[in-house]
């Protein structure tokens, strides 16, 4: 690979950051905002919302692998299909937050999320698969270099999306309308910036699902991704409830969310530098340990402890930065070795990553309701608040420990 060509590919990396920001804005922030929005605005029960989210993720059991296979077969039509998916996701987000439900709120919630999640799946699979092709042309540590741009953009996208409705609240009467419109504009801009990149993946032969699933390292990395992503899914789903009810600090949700995601975003280049010196696996194990310690403290916080929790947000946010950068880079590197087209591999990766969010929704939200917890109430019992603390902090600790053990016994390259 000539140095001039490598330099050209480096100049295209900002497009990956912007596109990742758009995708991430439709990921975790939806789980942060949508359940609470539909509870507060339309009175939908937590258990019902959790059930809908779980059913949608079960749909992904079939959808994501099939979308991966479809992507591998699109050929020259891929650019057009990706453009359509960007438009569909923008329309779904507008329908979710900026349009009054045309049917019952629960049904509308499910329909709009189906549009958002389906487009999200298709775009994510193609985006990460394209990253394998691009990273292979960037020389040594190419996967880490691309991951820094991609995940930094993703985390800044999460930061903006997480606090945007809270910020818009000070300027407009319908903050979620502003959020949805802003997302739609970002989707169009990001799709335009990445348009030239999609052609690079043409002509690569698909290796199929069997190649990915029969590879012991790829299989183990998928399992680790599932277990390691679950703590993020759990804490993201319960974050607003934890700050509002357990810490009794209404109004601090926005600043604490921003602190958490900014810490993650600014940690990405630092983790990348450490990984180049210590190795990717060793660095990821360090970050997992940091997350375990941080969530361990959060179990014991109570009313008014928002300042101590801010420290936890910094530490756990930094750990998230490593999770989102290093683990996908490890998987992408493996896909480059066994399945260069990578679409089926990232179809499986997308399913695994999102199924953890379904796990959190279907188990945690109903569990909170059964414990007697009520969102926005000042009279939640000590038992329900204790259950909230256990679900928010103790469950992620246990899952992270399991992921750390799995990674320790996985033979992967440190590059």
Label for each model-derived stretch:
Residues 2-415:
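Membrane-embedded alpha-helical bundles of multi-pass transporters/translocases
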